[in-house]
Amino acid sequence: MNLPLCLILLDFLTILNCFCDLSVLPTRRAVRILGRRYALTATGYKYLDIGINVGPPSYVEIAIGDHRGNELSLSLETWKGLYEQRWDIQDRLCKDVRGRPITVGPLTVRFSAMNDTKLVCLDSSDVRLMMTESTFLTMINLDHCIELTYAQLDRVVDKVEAKVAQFSNIASAETKDASNAIRASEFFNGNHIIDCELFALVFDTPM
């Protein structure tokens, strides 16, 4: 069996672990702009996204997800808490995965093992994501990247909010052809990435 196929099967098997409740349906995916996506596995099955969740209110969001549509949304405080607990989590994985879970803000970190592979389950009130130890470590190693990206995005949240309000006002006044009205308005700048992504992902989509 080649390595990529092994990784695909391992990702699939982690979903079936008893800690992952398959009755939990994925929630509707948020619209994020100006984002970055980091693949957490060689297959890209699991990922970490960071971008501005378009409101109102708009805010910077960190999300861990998979290609089945599951996404776990984290605040910066929860992400930092998870990072600060990394040594305790690694210690638990090295010793006994049958111990008590670790609480990080709204998250519960549980542990398991399957076929000699140590697993980490991130459990919130409505989403559960299972990952291997190596995937968890890959994610944690992105901490400085997340910190820098978060700071950059946080500086433009107010601009995004202002654009959303302007475009929304135009769309509510021009019900027949809101898309063209937005593009023709003085508020739209086709050479600005905020305008382009908002228009393409939010205001130029079928109702």
Locations of regions flagged by a protein language model:
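Short, exposed "boundary/linker" segments that immediately precede the start
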Residues: 2-3
